[in-house]
């Protein structure tokens, strides 16, 4: 969402597939497009000077958007991919609806819902035409899209609903009984890294205790969020412990006593301090706890 784009190098898909990695995109990047880095370069390459990232603009503009999404699906069709459906603005901005701006109140909300349902149908059609098989598809009811979902937006049963935390480690909402019964199931988008206005960001140092993360994810599991877990980690190196913990918890979740000794084990194996201790113990120069 914030840097580079997976599609920029065609070999990325093959390498990820070779390593057993399932690739997906965030809540604002549909059908494997990283809009912040792909939309404008793609328009320039195609020579489209009047297109906008807004599905409310009918006619040729919609056809250009469908072409943009379709080419991404074609590039990744041979790999294991999670496709995000729906639409928000470029780079985590709001849902663009310039053709609906004259509407107000409930009329505007109904028009937004109808538009988003149309977008999802058209995206599903692209996937069916290009893949000819079922694949993992997600929908993220987040920010302004959550309001539309709560007011009647119909999301196809096979789509996995991805719920988010509040950016500070607390899961805001669990699926209700009806949502738990969905064919596509439910997932979570959890932050160990957050890019926000000054004073709120924590990009490279996680401020959420692992014990709190465990409690929140355990409650999520117990409330039916069991299909897909996504962790926002920002930089890889500073959050190695959190990444390892998240992955191991996802593997063991549901088992009695899962992950109660993980932090101690990880510390003994992975930290520079313990590596120094092991080497010093061999020389018997001092004792380490």
Residue spans of the language-model regions?
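Acidic, Ser/Thr-rich peripheral helices and adjacent loops at domain boundaries
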Residues: 44-51, 246-260
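Catalytic domains of carbohydrate-active enzymes that cleave complex glycans
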Residues: 262-289
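Conserved, mostly hydrophobic/aromatic
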Residues: 161, 220, 232, 269-270
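Gly/Pro-rich turn-and-neighbor structural signature
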Residues: 10-19, 55-183, 289
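Catalytic adenosine-cofactor/nucleotide-binding cores of aminoacyl-tRNA synthetases and other
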Residues: 239-242
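Catalytic-core region of carbohydrate-active enzymes that cleave or remodel glycosidic bonds
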Residues: 203-231, 245-255
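Feature activates predominantly on carbohydrate-active enzymes
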Residues: 1-63, 140, 152-167, 177-209, ...
């Amino acid at each position: 969402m914030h840097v580079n784009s997976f599609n920029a190098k065609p070999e990325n898909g093959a390498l990820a597939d070779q390593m057993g990695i399932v690739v997906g995109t965030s809540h604002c990047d549909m059908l494997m497009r990283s809009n912040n880095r792909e939309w404008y370069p793609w328009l320039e390459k195609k020579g489209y000077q009047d297109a906008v990232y807004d599905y409310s603009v009918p006619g040729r503009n919609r056809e250009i958007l469908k072409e943009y999404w379709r080419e991404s699906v074609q590039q990744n069709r041979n790999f294991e991919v999670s496709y995000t459906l729906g639409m928000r603005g470029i780079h985590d901005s709001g849902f663009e609806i310039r053709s609906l701006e004259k509407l107000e109140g409930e009329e505007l909300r109904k028009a937004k819902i109808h538009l988003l349902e149309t977008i999802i149908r058209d995206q599903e059609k692209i996937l069916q035409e290009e893949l000819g098989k079922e694949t993992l598809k997600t929908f993220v009811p987040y920010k302004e899209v959550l309001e539309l979902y709560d007011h009647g937006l119909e999301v196809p049963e096979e789509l996995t609903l991805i719920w988010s935390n509040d950016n500070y480690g607390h899961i805001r909402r669990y699926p209700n009984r009806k949502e738990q019964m969905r064919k596509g199931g439910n997932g979570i988008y959890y932050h160990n890294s957050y890019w926000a206005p000054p004073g709120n960001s924590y990009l490279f140092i996680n401020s959420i205790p692992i014990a709190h993360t465990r409690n929140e994810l355990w409650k999520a599991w117990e409330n039916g969020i069991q299909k897909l877990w996504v962790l926002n980690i920002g930089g890889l190196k500073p959050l190695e412990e959190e990444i390892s913990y998240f992955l191991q918890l996802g593997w063991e979740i549901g088992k009695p006593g899962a992950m109660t000794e993980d932090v101690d084990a990880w510390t003994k194996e992975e930290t520079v301090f313990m590596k120094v201790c092991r080497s010093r113990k061999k020389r018997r120069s001092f004792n380490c706890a």
